[in-house]
Amino acid sequence: IIDPGGEANKIIESIAVEVVGIIITHHHFDHVGAIESIKNYYNAKVYDYGNLKEENNIGVFTFRVIPTPGHSDDSISVYFKDDNVMFVGDFVFNGSIGRTDLGGNEMDMKKSIETILSYDDSIRLYPGHYLSTTIGDERKNLEYFSKMF
């Protein structure tokens, strides 16, 4: 599970597999609200920027952690290469980027944008809110936002 923000009972009821881990892209309330309930229900370990390495295996999943501070100091993006998907929390949205005024930093955001732009355009991005997109679809937006800082 990635970023269980709330409604723990709905999350638990909708999952038909064993949960072995919970990944947090950043520690804002709307991404961590259901952690304790889900962690306790499944006896799952919680993973975040503090205890993940660059390359990770949790259960059957293999993924890369990419530090993407800017929206918050602890923001990470989680890239599943085999599936060509990246979970980006509130770092990037479809058509926009995350706010930097909630414990973030504009220069960190600029560096994080530059990091993500080094990845392949075909990677599907799943933000913490709203619709998914791809790096290619966001490239012009991200280049524009990067120049603002």
What feature does the model see in each segment?
Residues 6-49:
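Active-site metal-binding motif and surrounding structural segment of the metallo-beta-lactamase
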Residues 73-149:
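Metallo-beta-lactamase
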Residues 13, 36, 54-57, 77, ...:
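Short secondary-structure boundary/capping segments
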